[in-house]
Amino acid sequence: MEISWGRAMWRNFLGQSPDWYKLALLVFLIINPFIFLANPFIAGWLLVAEFIFTLAMALKCYPLLPGGLLAIEAVIIGMTSAAHVREEVAANLEVLLLLMFMVAGIYFMKQLLLFIFTRLLLSIRSKMVLSLAFCVAAAFLSAFLDALTVVAVVISVAVGFYGIYHRVASSRGEENDMLDDSHIDPHYKTVLEQFRGFLRSLMMHAGVGTALGGVMTMVGEPQNLIIAKAAGWHFGDFFLRMSPVTVPVLVCGLLTCMLVEKMRWFGYGETLPEKVRDVLQQFDDQSRKKRTRQDKIKLIVQAVIGVWLVTALALHLAEVGLIGLSVIILATALTGVTDEHAIGKAFTESLPFTALLTVFFSIVAVIIDQHLFAPIIQFVLQASEHAQLTLFYLFNGLLSSISDNVFVGTIYINEAKAAMENGAISLKQFELLAVAINTGTNLPSVATPNGQAAFLFLLTSALAPLIRLSYGRMVWMALPYTIVLTLIGLLCVEFTLAPATEWMTQAGWLATLS
């Protein structure tokens, strides 16, 4: 029997999302106009809370859909205007170009990155050294590339290796279903569980590595570019200004990596079973024998393009997005990727998040028009200049751990810049606050998958169910990093940031906005 029209519409609305989630969004959409008529300020804050809710519930439904509906309604009822949204998008065009072109560009360098991580996995036998190598490699790559792409590469390595061993363990060849363990011998199951634990720990180390490296440079995370643009910093300026906080945090993060592996705390410490290593080594040997001269040239070309990418970013030869576009052109032209559909696949990872970021800017426009953060900013600015840094760091960290750090970073840097332009704070203080905001949004956000896009990508990937990586387990395994990164970051903002910045300014290392 066919369902009713009403039931059909309900099923189509937000698709497979739970009924309670659909109902909650409908309630939001119904009550918002009435609350806006009664009190625009409260309605604005309610909209922000609703939007954060959609980000927190990203596993129920991709936030672009519910967040987009809320943003469209906000424009319709007059909380902001389409013209203001366009202005916000135009002001942040560099970030959108970064996401569109840089992520797509790195897609065409995946073979090189896969080669690097595969060699790491099979050539290093010590689990502690291997974990450290994955963390350092992810941190270095994320300082120049997009963290999402780095995690995507590590995921593809892990899925590939898991599939190879699972096929051997199940004896089902190409017909093997990686989610089905029913055909696996009990002995193999024990080895498989150990292998899952090994992959879980490596993925978490790599994920945290992207946060450690991503906070250090203006291209490491999307919000970094927004903050750098607001402060007028180039690549070198940004790195130096962040270093009083980010370098100690990096060192302590790597020490934490070694400690949890050594002590086998928080689900870490599992080693790669020898039986699995033998299977993977055989597969890698076969792959290397099959690698043609053409394949080897592709790897060399990608490595040269990687050098160009790092050089162009460091010397600020063009806007970040345009450098990414040059990577796309060079990588496709020199490796023989000429089909439109093959090129189009490179954009599938970045465009949904680019669209979501545009929705962010709509909510930012509402925040500006309704002066939502004015009371918070006034409260913070009433404190001493020294205390302001700590408060900005903590407020950013708290919000970033439950919401998306791009959203939070954009809001706070806009408010801090407005305060400087209004004469409430000095230029010198604004530049210190920009560092506190950047580190506050990047470091504590490793607490949950909601804060780091790369973590959320890992949680929603095909790998997560294979290695039994749930939301709760991810939060638990991230906990030691969350504590160390947040506390060390706070101490550095409190004690080392101002004196180190002053020393670098006097030494002539730092340029200042005029």
UniProtKB/Swiss-Prot annotation:
GO terms for cellular component: plasma membrane. It is found in: Cell inner membrane. It is a multi-pass membrane protein. The keyword Membrane applies. Keywords: Antiport, Cell inner membrane, Cell membrane, Ion transport, Membrane, Sodium, Sodium transport, Transmembrane, Transmembrane helix, Transport. GO terms for molecular function: sodium:proton antiporter activity. It holds the Pfam family NhaB. Its main location: membrane. It catalyses: 2 Na(+)(in) + 3 H(+)(out) = 2 Na(+)(out) + 3 H(+)(in). The chain crosses the membrane at residues 23-43, 63-83, 97-117, 120-140, 144-164, 202-222, 238-258, 303-323, 357-377, 391-411, 447-467, 475-495. Na(+)/H(+) antiporter that extrudes sodium in exchange for external protons. Belongs to the NhaB Na(+)/H(+) (TC 2.A.34) antiporter family. This is Na(+)/H(+) antiporter NhaB. It comes from Salmonella newport (strain SL254). The gene is nhaB.
